[in-house]
């Protein structure tokens, strides 16, 4: 029995080490290949430059940084509110006979490939936006709407689990104080699940900022500063995918450096939310 436990501990340790090693190797590859390129180009020119012309050895990724932030921010604003309300409905309002149907539909959304979402956006959302704005439908707003739909399953899944895990005593105590069902849900249960909701939002941000295929199909892909939500743009992930296939030399290194910037962005978001979570816990 002890031998079996020792073997299982060793297996778990190896699995954990493999996971950590994979992340470490990715970090080493990115920073070894990307950071030197940033210093070759010049950190200020690379991060704040507004012109991307690889043919002229001009590599300014500020338009792609702004594009990624704007698209992700709009998607989160639109998607998170819908996701939280959906989670509340599923966990506290949805009749049992409809729960399975609703949950299956959301799970199905999570399994749809990005290319299918992109095709849907290209065929349905882009023409609709073109009619509404009188411009090309490949815009920031179009990409944000599609990303908001794409992050729903991720945020709903985590948020619903967080709301469901809140002890029933919170809800019952609120009812005992004279609150209605809705007041108890929104002012007692949901606030108690805020840590899980924040985790869901972080996962949603990660999904949105890292999405590539669907964004390439509908965002316009112009490497220039976006001037409004009805203008086209290019994100950092789209920039890497569109040009990595034929890039070489400093151009290729600049694309890897773009990946470094994206990695740092994700890291900063995770650290920020982690610190916010600690404040929430200390506040409780």
Each language-model region and where it sits:
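Generic hydrophobic transmembrane alpha-helix motif, especially the helices
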Residues: 107-147
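Cytoplasmic-entry segments and transmembrane alpha-helices of multi-pass inner-membrane transporters
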Residues: 9, 82-121, 284
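Short membrane-interfacial helix/loop motifs at transmembrane-helix boundaries
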Residues: 27-58, 223-230
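Amphipathic cytosolic juxtamembrane alpha-helices at the membrane-cytosol interface
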Residues: 5, 95-100, 168, 172-199
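Interhelical loop and adjacent transmembrane-helix boundary motif
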Residues: 215-263
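Transmembrane alpha-helices
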Residues: 158-159, 181-217
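C-terminal transmembrane helix and the adjacent membrane-cytosol boundary/short C-terminal tail
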Residues: 160-164, 168, 175, 242-284
């Amino acid at each position: 029995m002890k031998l079996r436990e020792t073997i299982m501990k060793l297996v778990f340790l190896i699995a954990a080490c493999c996971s950590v090693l994979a992340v470490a190797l990715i970090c080493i590859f990115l920073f070894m290949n990307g950071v030197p390129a940033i210093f070759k180009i010049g950190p200020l020119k690379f991060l704040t430059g507004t012109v991307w012309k690889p043919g002229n050895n001009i590599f300014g990724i500020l338009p792609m940084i702004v594009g990624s932030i704007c698209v992700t921010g709009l998607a989160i604003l639109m998607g998170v509110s819908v996701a939280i309300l959906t989670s509340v409905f599923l966990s506290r309002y949805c009749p049992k006979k409809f729960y399975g149907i609703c949950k299956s539909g959301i799970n199905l959304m999570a399994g749809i490939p990005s290319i299918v979402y992109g095709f849907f956006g290209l065929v349905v959302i882009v023409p609709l936006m073109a009619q509404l704005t009188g411009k090309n439908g490949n815009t920031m707003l179009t990409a944000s709407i599609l990303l908001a739909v794409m992050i729903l399953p991720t945020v709903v899944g985590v948020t619903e689990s967080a709301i469901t895990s809140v002890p029933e005593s919170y809800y019952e105590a609120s009812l005992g104080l004279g609150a209605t069902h809705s007041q108890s849900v929104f002012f007692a249960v949901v606030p108690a699940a805020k840590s899980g909701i924040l985790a869901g939002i972080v996962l949603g941000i990660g999904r949105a900022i890292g999405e590539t295929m669907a964004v390439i199909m509908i965002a316009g892909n112009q490497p220039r500063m976006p001037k409004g939500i009805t203008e086209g743009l290019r994100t950092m992930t789209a920039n890497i995918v569109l040009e990595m296939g034929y890039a070489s030399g400093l151009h290729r290194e600049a694309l890897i450096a773009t990946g470094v910037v994206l990695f740092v962005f994700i890291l900063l978001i995770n650290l920020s939310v982690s610190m916010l979570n600690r404040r929430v816990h200390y506040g409780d």
